[in-house]
């Protein structure tokens, strides 16, 4: 059972219903019928461009053949330079440039939906027998089972005298599930009336370049044999003008433009020789930048070092000498300050004696033996006094009677204190006034803090009642 796609019919029915529904409104407002038709056509075009459906508004699956009759006065330079780019896996009726130059020549094309560029002065005949003569360059395509002429503007450059014409046609790669949808989309072509650009690459094997670019040249008169690694094939005389570009933004490039090809050829990616001095210079600069990033070296310092090596060495020596001097002075200061008392004293009596001897020997001409004897006597007397004072203090502490602690005779004992605060609700405040009526009490409190139910409250005024 054949699969029937109902989505296009659904879209078409919705569009027709809406157009019929607003037809009366357009008539009441005085809008012309052509505006409504243009609206419907625009709607259908938008749905088609959105790729919401496949085979949208396709009435026939037959592909009529389009016969092109080349005139006798057509310049012979057109045929050997004509080129087409078609996807791999498709076949094209073979014909040679010699066949195109014959008097009664014709070519049949069976590409439905693909536009064909027809230059001025050419006549073409459809399968129905209608003959059309072209006076200006046009684009011919076939959609919905009929042949249409699209006069879209395309780029033209004035042709130089005696130069061949280059026509380039690009066709997108077709997925099996979107083959019919892709045939509906018309691709614009650019006819560039200028000589093909001349590439100036270094001496490189042409066969090697073609294999690297995944292109295969097709000889005239032979059927296309697609290559698995390359999705596109080229015919003889193919040109890559710099202005050639796809006008559909949604399509991927068919082949690289001549600029990128020229860049690849000039960069010589196929050469196997040793790298040049520029390559070595780049490697050295990259290694130097890597070292700078590792060691934290500044690029400006490196530049300054390269420009002024002698001054930098002198400044480095001065900085090094100043740093050594500062370190030496700091070490001397640390060695002079020695802890000789307190808990951090780790020096022995011999070290202390040597330090005192060094201090006393600093001024040998001022301090004599008599002065030293007087100092020793004063030290001995002070030591005896301190010993006597310490012994008197110890005797006084032993003979002093023990006294009772303060508040020892209070009525409240220590055991009764916890009972006073054996409650969860505590109020600390000031009493404003208290009223009593028999066993009822009423309290007026102010400026207090209350802990009630495990939560703390601060209040300015409070009233409480109690019975007991």
UniProtKB/Swiss-Prot annotation:
Biased composition (Acidic residues): 401-416
MF-aspect GO terms: DNA binding
Tissue: Testis specific. Expressed in pachytene spermatocytes and haploid spermatids.
Gene Ontology biological process terms, A to Z: cognition; transcription initiation at RNA polymerase II promoter
Cellular component annotations (GO), alphabetically ordered: cytoplasm; male germ cell nucleus; transcription factor TFIIA complex
Organism superkingdom: Eukaryota
SUPFAM superfamilies per record: Transcription factor IIA (TFIIA), alpha-helical domain, Transcription factor IIA (TFIIA), beta-barrel domain
Annotated region described as Disordered, given as residue ranges: 215-236, 379-416
Parts of the chain that traverse the membrane: none
InterPro entries: TFIIA_asu/bsu, TFIIA_b-brl
Keyword annotations of the record: DNA-binding, Nucleus, Transcription, Transcription regulation
Compartments, as annotated in UniProt: Nucleus
Biased composition (Polar residues): 380-391
One Pfam family linked to the record: TFIIA
Family of this protein: Belongs to the TFIIA subunit 1 family.
Biological role: May function as a testis specific transcription factor. Binds DNA in conjunction with GTF2A2 and TBP (the TATA-binding protein) and together with GTF2A2, allows mRNA transcription.
PANTHER family (UniProt xref): TFIIA-ALPHA AND BETA-LIKE FACTOR, TRANSCRIPTION INITIATION FACTOR IIA SUBUNIT 1
Name listed for the protein in its UniProt record: TFIIA-alpha and beta-like factor
Gene that encodes it: Gtf2a1l
């Amino acid at each position: 059972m054949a699969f029937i796609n109902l989505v296009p019919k659904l879209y078409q029915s919705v569009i027709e219903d809406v157009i019929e529904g607003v037809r009366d409104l357009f008539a009441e407002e005085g809008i012309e019928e052509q505006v409504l038709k243009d609206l419907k056509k625009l709607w259908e075009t938008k749905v088609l461009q959105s790729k919401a459906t496949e085979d949208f508004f396709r009435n026939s699956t037959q592909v009529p053949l389009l016969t092109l009759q080349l005139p006798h006065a057509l310049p012979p330079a057109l045929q050997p330079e004509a080129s087409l780019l078609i996807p791999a896996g498709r076949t094209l009726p073979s014909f040679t440039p010699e066949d195109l130059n014959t008097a009664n020549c014709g070519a049949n094309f069976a590409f439905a939906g693909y536009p064909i560029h027809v230059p001025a002065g050419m006549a073409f005949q459809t399968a129905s027998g209608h003959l059309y003569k072209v006076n200006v360059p046009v684009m011919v395509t076939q959609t919905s089972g009929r042949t249409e002429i699209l006069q879209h503007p395309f780029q033209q450059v004035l042709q130089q005298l005696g130069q061949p014409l280059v026509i380039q046609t690009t066709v997108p790669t077709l997925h099996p599930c979107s083959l019919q949808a892709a045939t509906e989309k018309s691709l614009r072509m650019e006819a560039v009336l200028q000589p093909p650009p001349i590439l100036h690459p270094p001496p490189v094997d042409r066969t090697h370049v073609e294999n690297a670019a995944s292109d295969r040249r097709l000889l005239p008169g032979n059927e296309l044999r697609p290559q698995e690694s390359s999705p596109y094939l080229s015919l003889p005389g193919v040109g890559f003008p710099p202005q050639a570009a796809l006008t559909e933004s949604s399509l991927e490039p068919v082949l690289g433009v001549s600029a990128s090809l020229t860049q690849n050829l000039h960069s010589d990616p196929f050469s196997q020789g040793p790298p040049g001095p520029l390559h070595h210079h780049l490697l050295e600069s990259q290694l130097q930048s890597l070292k700078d990033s590792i060691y934290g070296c500044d690029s400006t310092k490196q530049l300054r070092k390269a420009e002024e090596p002698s001054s930098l060495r002198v400044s480095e020596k001065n900085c090094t000498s100043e740093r050594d001097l500062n370190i030496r002075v700091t070490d001397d200061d640390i060695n002079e300050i020695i802890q000789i008392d307190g808990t951090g004293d780790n020096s022995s009596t011999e070290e202390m004696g040597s330090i005192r001897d060094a201090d006393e020997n600093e001024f040998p001409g001022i301090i004599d033996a008599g002065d030293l004897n007087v100092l020793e006597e004063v030290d001995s007397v002070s030591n005896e006094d301190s010993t006597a004072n310490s012994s008197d203090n110890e005797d006084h502490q032993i003979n002093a009677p023990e006294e009772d602690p303060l508040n020892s005779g209070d009525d409240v004992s220590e055991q009764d204190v916890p009972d006073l605060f054996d409650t969860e609700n505590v109020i600390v405040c000031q009493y404003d006034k208290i009223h009593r009526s028999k066993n009822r009490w009423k309290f007026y409190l102010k400026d207090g803090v209350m802990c009630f139910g495990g939560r703390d409250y601060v209040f300015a005024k409070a009233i409480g009642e109690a019975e007991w």
